[in-house]
């Protein structure tokens, strides 16, 4: 029997820890997001086990969507297995009803474990220490567990523990305008002779979600862990499943309560087999014990961190904040399931309804490409598996090829809501689903970025090429020919900056459309010359004719690129420079821009203020298209007009700031990005993690300060720059199958090959090296 580790014995070093030192129920929503535990299959928000005022409990399973009475399909808040209530002589103990003598919660990012340490005094003067930890297993993704250490400090008496699975959950429970119930309970039963089972079904497609749970209660000092509960009752409480147990509490004697939970859905097994699957897995989990699964879970995190961890010496704040972003990003992926992706808010909350945006391909995917290539391929396979839906989406909109939706769920069709609210709470039409077309090229771009970093020719031949060709076909049909100017234009769009709608010839969109078609033509040539069997197979499959290819060449050649090479200032879209100009001069306590005086936030489209990086984003993703002076001129112009109302923005300005020499602002933008959730500088951490910002923060560390980039010849270049107080930066990446470790100090840069048989050619500060 394994030794039980108490909180202090299990917890790691301080550099891996995120603390909550004070209880304030007004901050519950923020900490529930920060302390979410997820394994890519399911995510459990960091609510208190016993419940508290102002909480936003959430349990989410990747791929479980439903529309019901909502505007669009949304990620379902499924039954909450985590509730565990404590009673002293029949009186419930809750944080809001007791005097808190001690309080602390700690997220251990190294192990993927959430700890708690509380001492409470009830209204009868009884003092109880409640410590513990919980985890959502990375080893067996269906398993989760909670361990409580309960110690009566000044009394003896009967202590009750209520184990609950709550099926009364709602989506948007705190918002009457949007409140929806997506589930109905179909089974509420006892399980394993000493546990509870709740099975629910979604209201539209009858997708089943099954959760089983049981408790084990024993004295801490008992190495045999004999049950000490003298009473147990199973109670099916309508939509909630419960069991209630009692034991005798003795002064200063610690009792351990282990809660085991297992979750399966009809995506995993047939509906008729769900209860058997849950029961068998739960029985095995309990038989093997809490500690065995915890050890396996921690071992999986050790594997992930062995590549993913980045160390910053000399700046503890940046070091921990960066690690926090990496932790949540790498925890959010399920590399075994190519039918799900990572939503904009991860599995951490209901924000953006669990939908997948361009955030995944442009902001998150680079982390996985260089740190976890297997997961990167899986995320791109999600887009391939949704390719038929993208074809239908294009056809519905009157275009050819494949048009990826702005917001995607489990079907691959457009799921953007039609209505929302502006900054003053006024109802507004949401046009992004109709007009923000650049996502189609973003997906194709991500496919190519993955390929050039991995050389995964199998993926490119069987999946990636088809994505690039069908998206190129979309752009060739989306472009409009203007005869009097003899050029193709892309009108009535929204670029990355969403303050401006219905614009013509957005620079980012036009550049990416041109790139997409050009890359499609290159792939056709490569397939025809070097992979003729694949060439004939794919052109036959998608009915691509030589005549259509010639049309692509014409469109690609004549796409209007709005760039004045003399002025070197790129107009974000036609007419942008004619808008009313405001310059940002003030910043709030989080160093976020404050609206300039006189701005009407209901008419932002009439100004030059922009929501997020647009032209700057373009120059970062296509650096070879612009010289250094052009990058500097455009960075300086747009930086003063960017409100950073999207968490995606600061990281891009940080990297470009480093490229053009604005080091001070680059570091500030990096901290903005790294602490978007830790400091809640967007004010909406309650809705879920800013997953794209997590990816962007990693990009600043590696592509920015770490200086990693790929040149025109496809060679890896490292040209780093460290902030003054940073003594050393160290990171690891995979490059074409080899694992490299890069260490940047003030005076030197070292690169080691840790794995890989092939010789790797790189350039460090312009000097060629072979590893």
Curated annotation (Swiss-Prot):
UniProt catalytic activity: kojibiose + phosphate = beta-D-glucose 1-phosphate + D-glucose
E.C. designation(s): 2.4.1.230
Sequence positions that bind substrate: 358-359, 611-612
Any one Gene Ontology molecular-function term assigned to this protein's record: carbohydrate binding
Matching InterPro entries: 6-hairpin_glycosidase_sf (IPR008928), 6hp_glycosidase-like_sf (IPR012341), Gal_mutarotase_sf_dom (IPR011013), Glyco_hydro_65_C (IPR005194), Glyco_hydro_65_M (IPR005195), Glyco_hydro_65_N (IPR005196), Glyco_hydro_65_N_sf (IPR037018), Malt_Pase/Glycosyl_Hdrlase (IPR017045)
Listed GO biological process terms: carbohydrate metabolic process
Top-level EC class as recorded in UniProt: transferase
Keywords: Carbohydrate metabolism, Glycosyltransferase, Transferase
Residues at the catalytic site: 498
Pfam families: Glyco_hydro_65C, Glyco_hydro_65m, Glyco_hydro_65N
SUPFAM superfamilies: Galactose mutarotase-like, Six-hairpin glycosidases
Purpose: Catalyzes the reversible phosphorolysis of kojibiose into beta-D-glucose 1-phosphate (Glc1P) and D-glucose.
Family note: Belongs to the glycosyl hydrolase 65 family.
Name used for this protein in its record: Kojibiose phosphorylase
Organism: Caldanaerobacter subterraneus subsp. tengcongensis (strain DSM 15242 / JCM 11007 / NBRC 100824 / MB4) (Thermoanaerobacter tengcongensis)
């Amino acid at each position: 029997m394994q030794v039980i580790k108490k909180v202090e014995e299990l917890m790691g070093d301080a550099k891996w820890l995120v603390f909550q030192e004070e209880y304030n129920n007004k901050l519950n929503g923020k900490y529930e997001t920060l302390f979410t535990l997820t394994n890519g299959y399911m995510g459990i928000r960091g609510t208190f086990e016993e419940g508290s005022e102002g909480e936003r409990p959430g349990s989410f399973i990747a791929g479980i969507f439903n529309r019901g009475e909502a505007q669009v399909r949304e990620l379902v808040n499924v039954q909450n297995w985590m509730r565990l209530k404590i009673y002293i002589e029949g009186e419930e103990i809750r944080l809001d009803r007791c005097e808190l003598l001690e309080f602390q919660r700690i997220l251990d990012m190294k192990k993927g474990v959430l700890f708690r340490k509380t001492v409470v005094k009830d209204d009868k003067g009884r003092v109880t220490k409640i410590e513990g930890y919980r985890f959502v297993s990375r080893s067996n993704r269906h398993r989760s567990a909670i361990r409580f250490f309960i110690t009566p400090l000044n009394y003896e008496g009967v202590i009750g523990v209520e184990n609950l699975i709550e099926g009364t959950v709602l989506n948007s429970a705190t918002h009457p305008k949007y409140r929806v119930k997506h589930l109905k309970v179909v089974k509420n039963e006892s399980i394993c002779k000493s546990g509870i089972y709740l099975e629910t079904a979604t209201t539209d497609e009858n997708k089943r979600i099954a959760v089983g749970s049981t408790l084990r209660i024993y004295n801490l000092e008992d190495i045999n862990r004999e049950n000490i509960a003298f009473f147990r009752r199973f109670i099916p409480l309508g939509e909630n499943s419960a069991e209630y147990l009692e034991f005798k509490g003795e002064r200063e004697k610690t009792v351990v309560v282990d809660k085991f939970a297992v979750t399966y859905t009809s995506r995993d097994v047939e509906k008729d087999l769900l209860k058997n699957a849950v029961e068998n897995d739960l029985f095995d989990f309990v038989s093997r014990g809490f500690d065995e699964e915890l050890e396996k879970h921690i071992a999986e995190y050790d594997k992930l961190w062995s590549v993913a961890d980045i160390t910053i010496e000399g700046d503890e704040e940046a070091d921990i904040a960066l690690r926090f972003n990496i932790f949540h990003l790498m925890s959010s992926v399920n590399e075994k399931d190519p039918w799900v992706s990572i939503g904009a808010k991860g599995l951490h909350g209901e924000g953006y309804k669990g939908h997948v945006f361009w955030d995944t391909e442009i902001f998150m995917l680079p982390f996985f490409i260089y740190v976890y290539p297997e997961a990167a391929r899986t995320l791109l396979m999600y887009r391939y598996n949704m390719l038929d839906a993208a074809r239908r989406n294009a056809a519905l909109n009157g275009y050819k090829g494949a048009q990826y939706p702005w917001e995607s769920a489990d079907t691959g069709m457009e799921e953007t809501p039609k209505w929302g609210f502006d900054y003053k709470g006024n109802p507004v039409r949401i046009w992004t689903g109709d007009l923000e077309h650049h996502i189609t090229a973003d997906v194709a771009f991500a496919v190519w970025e993955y390929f050039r970093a991995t050389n995964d020719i199998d993926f490119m031949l069987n999946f990636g090429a088809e994505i690039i060709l069908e998206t190129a076909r979309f752009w060739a049909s989306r472009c409009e020919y203007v005869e009097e100017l003899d050029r193709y234009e892309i009108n009535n769009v929204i670029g990355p900056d969403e303050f401006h709608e219905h614009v013509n010839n957005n620079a980012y969109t036009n550049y990416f459309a041109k790139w997409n078609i050009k890359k499609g033509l290159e792939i056709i040539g490569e397939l025809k010359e070097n992979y003729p069997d694949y060439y004939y197979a794919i052109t036959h499959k998608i009915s691509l004719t030589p005549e259509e290819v010639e049309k692509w060449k014409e469109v690609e050649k004549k796409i209007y690129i709005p760039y004045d090479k003399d002025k070197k200032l790129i107009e974000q879209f036609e007419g942008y420079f004619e808008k009313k100009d405001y310059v940002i001069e003030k910043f709030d306590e989080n160093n976020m821009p404050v609206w300039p005086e006189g701005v009407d936030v209901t008419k932002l489209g009439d100004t030059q203020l922009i929501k997020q990086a647009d032209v700057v984003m373009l120059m970062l993703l296509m650096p070879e298209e612009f010289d250094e002076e052009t990058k500097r001129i455009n960075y300086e112009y747009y930086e003063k007009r960017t409100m950073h109302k999207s968490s995606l923005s600061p990281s891009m300005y940080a990297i470009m700031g480093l490229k053009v020499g604005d080091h001070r602002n680059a570091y500030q933008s990096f901290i903005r990005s790294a602490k978007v959730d830790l400091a809640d500088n967007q004010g909406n951490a309650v809705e879920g993690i800013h997953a794209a910002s997590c990816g962007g923060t990693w990009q600043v560390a590696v592509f920015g300060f770490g200086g990693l980039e790929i040149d025109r010849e496809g060679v890896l270049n490292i040209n780093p720059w460290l902030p003054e107080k940073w003594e050393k930066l160290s990171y690891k990446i995979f490059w074409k199958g080899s694992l490299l470790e890069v260490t940047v100090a003030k005076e030197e840069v070292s690169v080691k090959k840790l794995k890989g048989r092939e010789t790797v050619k790189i350039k460090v500060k312009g000097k060629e090296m072979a590893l």
